[in-house]
Amino acid sequence: MLLRDILFVLITTVAVYASIYAPQPILPLLAGEFGLTTSGGALLMTAVLLPLSFAPLFYGLLLESQPAKRMLLVTIAALALLQAAFGAAESYGLLITARLFQGACVPAILAAITSYLAYTVDREHIQRAMTYYVAANILGGFVGRVLSGWVATNAGWRYTFYLIALALAGCFVAVTRMKADSRLSLSSVRLSAVMPILRNGDIARLYAVAFTIFFAFMALLTFLPFRLKEIDPSYTAFVISMMYSGFLMGIVMSVGATRIIGLCGGERRAMTIGLVLFGISMLLINVPSGAGIFAIMFVMCGGMFFVHAVAMGTMNKLATENRAVANGLYISIYYTGAALGSWLPGLIYQSAGWAAFTLTLTAAIAGAVVITRGLRFSG
């Protein structure tokens, strides 16, 4: 695989994840402008995550019979137009509609990217390739949030989405220059391809861990802006967006995941350590201080994204056949967790408060630790 093509794939990943998470730090602002409740504002995240929860499996299956590059070109173009539509929307209904259609495009792009990597990178290097992919999606989430907060504070929130649309247009041009993924199998699409993957107990457990960590993490990220407004109503969108700076630690941990796995003595132990850090930071996030939350987010993001990088890389090593399907299923499962987490725990937050909310999420993370200890491969 050409280094240039890897760079194009990673830049596209950054732009796509920026498009997903850009609204998150400005949810209180959007809720105020459109007269929404906390849960109504959170639905702007659920709307894009819900299609992500079931569409990736279909796209993963389709990629066993279609070139990933072709799907990338079609869906990147559509996503760019939908970002511009979100920026121009004048009603809550149009915002939700644009987000739903964005959610239909994003999983196609992500499944195409992971499949492109899986089929064009040598098996010996797939773990490292996937950790760089995870690092790119973390960077994209961070860039999208900070860009959104800064632009909303200084120029108006709509310009964020016009800028993202332009970035995606640039990605479209870059993808046209990528080498075709000729090694993809042109087999027929069969849903039965899913069952052999799920029969692998270790892969099934990795899927369960992915569901749980994204459920807890997305819940925290979605409702954190509202919590910060409770702590200090004077916080601007940019100040709130900077609370996501901990994502930078997630990049470091993901890129270094392969080396850290060796230091920990294997994937299972490494994932357990990451989950424990994630759980402890979820308890500490109760501190009623913006500065404290800022610091804790570095630990939380480092632990969570390390677990994600290890789980995804390990799953690709264990999936000896139909990797596009395995990746599509992984994306589907963890975004199912994210979609549920972006709304359901908010009911606890609204009715019982922040402490009950974070305790519930900590209990979910503890469940992921139990699942991880049941993994049968070495380490």
Residue ranges of each PLM-predicted region?
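Helix-loop-helix hairpin linking two adjacent transmembrane segments in secondary transporters
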Residues: 123-177
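Cytoplasmic helix-loop-helix junction between adjacent transmembrane helices
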Residues: 98-137
